[in-house]
Amino acid sequence: MREYNTIFNHALAPITPGPSSSNTCGPVRIGLICQQLLGEIPAKAVVEYYSKGAFTTTLYGMKSDVAFINGLLGKEQNNPEFNAAYTIAKEVGMDVSFAEVDDLTVGGMETVRIRMTDQSGFEMVVIGESIGGGAFKIHYIDDC
């Protein structure tokens, strides 16, 4: 399918399944960069969010959980199967969970630490932050 640059996608905001670009596009993109850094769909992923951060109240209601899973599956935010992320993760054998933690104080209110394990047992940790408008920052990649 051919993609066209449009003012709506590239100047105003990314195409997002909603309800909020910082709660869906940012998390999808964080998950996607994590999957790309790992080099494959993780066998296991734990998405940790700060107990005093924004995801404590928005993770499930704003579909951020679904967005992180889509990214970890290597899918973009405009993927037509966006809402089926949990089912697809199960089908491909990805064990994913979410955990509230007290020790994640780097970054802003929408920061997560994603702990991933690949099929061979290799582990990687990435800390990323959704900063609005579908943009994100990576604060940490395995001691880098």
Per-region residue spans from a language model:
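Accessory carbohydrate-recognition regions in carbohydrate-active enzymes
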Residues: 26, 30, 34-39, 46-50, ...
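Conserved phosphate/anionic-ligand binding catalytic regions in large, soluble enzymes, centered on
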Residues: 12-33
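A structural-propensity feature for long, helix-poor, extended segments
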Residues: 46-95
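Glycine-rich beta-alpha junction loops
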Residues: 50-54, 118, 132-134
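Acidic-glycine-rich active-site phosphate/pyrophosphate-binding loop
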Residues: 1-8, 39-44
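C-terminal edge-of-domain segments
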Residues: 90-129
